[in-house]
């Protein structure tokens, strides 16, 4: 992309973003950028942002790689512990890099019941709190009297 036909104002960008359109904008220092992160999902949720969708795809691939090495292992507590430990390490690495604010992997007798063990199924639940991106910045400037103390 070498240019944009219409230079968008801040208000233009905000108007487009309010109706779920990520505007393409030109900034002197940054160049041409997609200025937004919304998806076309109509229902408000964490998945209506591109960064969360991409994170979820990445997490599913990573945990699936861990799961694939667990296939055909004994469906016992030691295997569960190994899977959970490896998933915790993977998710912890993502958290350290600010992709997640928190997570929990549940893999125990509440998720993998004796009935599931008898059917050769290991069942884990991965709860995640994705990090959210800043979309708007609000800054207040407050003018105070000359004698005012900022400690009060």
Where are the language model's segments positioned?
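Structured, hydrophobic secondary-structure cores that serve as assembly/anchoring elements
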Residues: 1-152
């Amino acid at each position: 992309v070498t240019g944009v036909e219409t230079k968008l104002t801040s208000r233009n960008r905000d108007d487009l973003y309010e109706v779920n359109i990520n505007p393409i904008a030109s900034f002197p220092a940054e160049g041409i950028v997609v200025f937004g992160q919304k998806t076309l999902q109509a229902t408000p949720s964490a998945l209506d942002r591109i960064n969360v969708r991409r994170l979820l795809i990445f997490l599913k691939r990573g945990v699936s790689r861990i799961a694939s090495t667990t296939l055909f292992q004994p469906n016992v507590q030691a295997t569960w512990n190994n899977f959970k430990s490896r998933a915790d390490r993977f998710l912890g690495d993502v958290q350290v890099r600010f992709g997640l604010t928190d997570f929990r992997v549940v893999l125990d007798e509440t998720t993998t019941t004796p009935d599931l063990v008898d059917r050769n199924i290991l069942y884990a639940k991965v709860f995640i709190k994705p990090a959210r991106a800043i979309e708007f910045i609000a800054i207040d400037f407050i003018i105070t009297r000359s004698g005012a103390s900022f400690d009060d």
